[in-house]
Amino acid sequence: MTGKEKKLWGGRFQEKPSSILERIGESVSFDHKLYKEDIQGSIAHARMLKQIGILSGDELSKIETSLLQIKTELEEGKLEFKSELEDIHMHIESRLTELIGETGKKLHTARSRNDQVTQDVRLYILGRGKEILKSIVSLRFSLYEKAKRSVDVIIPGYTHLQVAQPIRASQYLLSWFWALERDQEFFRFALKASDELALGGGAMAGVNYATDREFLKKELGLSKVSPNSMDGVSSRDHILEFLFACTQLMIHASRICEDIILYSSQEFGILKLSDSLTTGSSIMPQKKNPDIAELIRGKAGRVIGNLNHLLVMLKGLPSTYNRDLQEDKLALFDSVETVEISLEGIREMIEDWVWVPERAESSLKNGFATATDLADFLVYEKKVPFRTAHELVGTLVRVCVEQKRTLFDLPEPDRIAVSEHFVGKEYENAVSLSLSADKKISYGGTSKKRQEEQLKIALESLKQTETLFL
């Protein structure tokens, strides 16, 4: 091979790499996203090499200055990517050698691409994971603010996608607030797996130098050092745990979007999205489509698929490093970007939508949403056994359906024909929509008192998250 064509690993080879080897082996088309972490890790590694006497102070200065120059070149799009250099790590090292010659070739002392790459990925997960955490907190804050303004809005609560019971809209919003708190904690847990130094493990057996891994740990701001070089370079548990967290979050995101799609439809109509967050049809002029919600619902499948991709890839690998692991980054990068834009889209929709109380009331009445309250009235006030009460109310609902009426407009004689207790103010209070919500007085329930209590707890939860970003 000529000097220009020679790989950084090419000393053992006499033949030029085939075109298919270069095309299938290149990863710079996607792993260029690790350039910041690679330069961060390389600067720390260079400082450690100076610490143990491999580099002089002048050499370290040249390496640091040149690496920062390369970072600027990458950010300004001035560094051309070449498939023969395979990945971002080789591009940076090759450019470093161009800039400072033989000194640049010293940087890879006591380091393999195996430990270099896994360390870069860990740093990437820590950085982007913290940004995702901030986005989750921002979304939770939007839900909290919307819930505060929605306490007096009564909407249907659904089971089996059928009208079940009246709830305050704040209860619905806070249900997702708490789900996202679990996602937040899952991400915090998942990030701990990446908060570890793998650099210094070499190819897999360690290196023939008395490297200072504690120094590296402190330079990179990490909490611990991997105790076993084989495990450190080959494990992808940190990516798996991160993708598990992404998957759980996107399942919640998809379900929120499903609700938005349904609740904004003509059939439900209990909320409206503004024109700026919806699209029209190329043929049907009346259409107003919730595309953001539909796209996020679709994107959730991608993230679930990314997790499955990595699980299947890892299950049959022998110890330690295998080239298959190059494919882990595609799943990781796509999941990060998908989660970030999905959180932003959901937050915009939540802050934008308006409730339609009159449609909510109509659904509640036509869905006999206070039938359970009426049965409880018979049990508590009239001492009717619950099963008997259940049967009486069921009969009353059947009469309403047959007459195409609701519990609110069925004539009193027809009600009395079912039960003598279905009369007067007591009956009206028993089927009242607003009173129904306020009867749910158990902790965590939808009564106004419990909602105000829950909002205080939610605010306290948000305040506690401030420590995440100090």
Swiss-Prot record:
Keyword Ribonucleoprotein among UniProt keywords: no
What's the protein called, per UniProt?
Answer: Argininosuccinate lyase
Keyword Amino-acid biosynthesis part of the UniProt annotation: yes
The protein's predominant localisation is cytoplasm
Its localization reads: Cytoplasm
Q: Name one GO biological process term.
A: arginine biosynthetic process via ornithine
Record's keyword terms, sorted: Amino-acid biosynthesis, Arginine biosynthesis, Cytoplasm, Lyase
Q: Record's PANTHER family?
A: ARGININOSUCCINATE LYASE (PTHR43814:SF1)
Molecular function GO labels: argininosuccinate lyase activity
| InterPro entries assigned | Arg_succ_lyase_C, Argininosuccinate_lyase, Fumarase/histidase_N, Fumarate_lyase_CS, Fumarate_lyase_fam, Fumarate_lyase_N, L-Aspartase-like
